[in-house]
Curated annotation (Swiss-Prot):
Region of interest called Disordered, as start-end residue ranges on this chain: 73-192
Protein name: Amelogenin, Y isoform
Signal peptide: 1-16
Pfam families, sorted: Amelogenin
Annotated Low complexity bias: 87-105
Composition bias, Pro residues: 132-173
Reported function: Plays a role in the biomineralization of teeth. Seems to regulate the formation of crystallites during the secretory stage of tooth enamel development. Thought to play a major role in the structural organization and mineralization of developing enamel.
The keyword Glycosyltransferase is annotated on this UniProt entry: no
GO CC annotation, single: extracellular region
Comp. bias intervals (Polar residues): 108-117
InterPro entries documented for this protein: Amelogenin
Length: 192
C-alpha cells in the first residue's frame, strides 16, 4: 500500500509540473525541495524509529525476556529465596549436562555472580533433587552453574562450528623452499 501511495504522489507531482509547449523548448522538470522534501519525510516515516543494529536490541531484549519468564517459574521452585537468585536456578537445569567445565566460567565471572554463589546452594539443591537424586555429590558444582547461564550467551559464538567449516585456502600457496646459499664460516656474523 505504501508503494501505491508513493506512486500516486509521484504521478500527481509529474502531472502538476508544466511541460514545454513545443518540442524544441528546453523545458526541465525541476524536482527540487517542493517534491523531494515531502518524499524524504515520507520515507523517514516508513523507517523504524530505532537504529537497525541487529545485535543491540536483540541482545538487550533477550536478557530482559529470559529473566521475567524465569522469575515466573522461580516461585514454583522455591519461594523463600529472593527473585534475584531464583532466575538462575531454572536456567541451570538445561545447562548442567552441557557444560562440564563450570569452574572456568566461574573464574571469568564478575563479582555480582560471586554474590549469588553463597545463596544458591539451597534452591539449587531443591531444584536438582527431582532430576538427579544425588544432590550432595553435586554440591560443589551447584554454586558454579548459576555462573554459566550468564556466561551462556558469550560461549554461543564458539557453538556454530558444529556446522562443518571448510578450511580457508592459504593466502600464499605452500611452495617448496629454495635452498639457501652456503655460507662461509668467515662471513658468518657472530652471535653472542
Amino acid at each position: 500500500m505504501g508503494t501505491w501511495i508513493l506512486f500516486a504522489c509521484l504521478l500527481g507531482a509529474a502531472y502538476s509540473m508544466p511541460l514545454p509547449p513545443h518540442p524544441g523548448h528546453p523545458g526541465y522538470i525541476n524536482f527540487s525541495y517542493e517534491v523531494l522534501t515531502p518524499l524524504k519525510w515520507y520515507q523517514n516515516m516508513l523507517r523504524y524509529p530505532y537504529p537497525s543494529y541487529g545485535y543491540e536490541p536483540v541482545g538487550g531484549w533477550l536478557h530482559h525476556q529470559i529473566i521475567p519468564v524465569v522469575s515466573q517459574q522461580s516461585p514454583q521452585n522455591h519461594a523463600l529465596q529472593p527473585h534475584h537468585h531464583n532466575p538462575m536456578v531454572p536456567a541451570q537445569q538445561p545447562v548442567v549436562p552441557q557444560q562440564p567445565m563450570m569452574p572456568v566460567p566461574g573464574q571469568h565471572s564478575m563479582t555480582p555472580i560471586q554474590h549469588h554463589q553463597p545463596n544458591l546452594p539451597l534452591p539449587a539443591q531443591q531444584s536438582f533433587q527431582p532430576q538427579p537424586i544425588q544432590p550432595q555429590p553435586h554440591q560443589p558444582l551447584q554454586p558454579q552453574p548459576p555462573v554459566h547461564p550468564i556466561q551462556r550467551l558469550p560461549p554461543q559464538p564458539p557453538l556454530p562450528p558444529i556446522f562443518p567449516m571448510q578450511p580457508l585456502p592459504p593466502v600464499l600457496p605452500d611452495l617448496p623452499l629454495e635452498a639457501w646459499p652456503a655460507t662461509d664460516k668467515t662471513k658468518r656474523e657472530e652471535v653472542d
